[in-house]
């Protein structure tokens, strides 16, 4: 995956690529454009391409981009969320995709409004050192969450073979169903078609749209 910013984004090309993805997903999933590597001055190209939903990984970048382009998009927070950043992130976003710690729950209790909705990040793969709630602990974590839990999110182990992600996506869908949750944020540039097949309702795309 690249670690350089995307410049000279062609709105027409991006619009065409978005249509390809939307058609392939049969309209079942929202396409969230991850803008971590989209500089502030290129956000207008996303708007011109018809992008409606964007996701940011860092609170500082979210604040800067939202200040200039706040009315152009719906905004989600998709990065690792530090508890001390919750207060700043909440007013700017529709959803937080990465709630996974009790320290974040404590900040949500202090600062969230009545319409706040979050997704719980689940460590479906059981990887050590990886963020996310363990599946066995999920019901209790949902019970402790002081705001509305709309669904779940996961990041499977990285693989060049999209099929390697399938069992993790299928497991997340099972967990969502058993906990009566509607939203499934899963699938990124390397494995989104598999995620769509397994029931994703939000697909997070960056690199696949811009190169």
Where in this protein do the model-derived segments appear?
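Conserved alpha/beta-domain cores
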Residues: 1-190, 196-198, 210
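Divalent-metal-activated hydrolytic enzyme cores
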Residues: 201-202
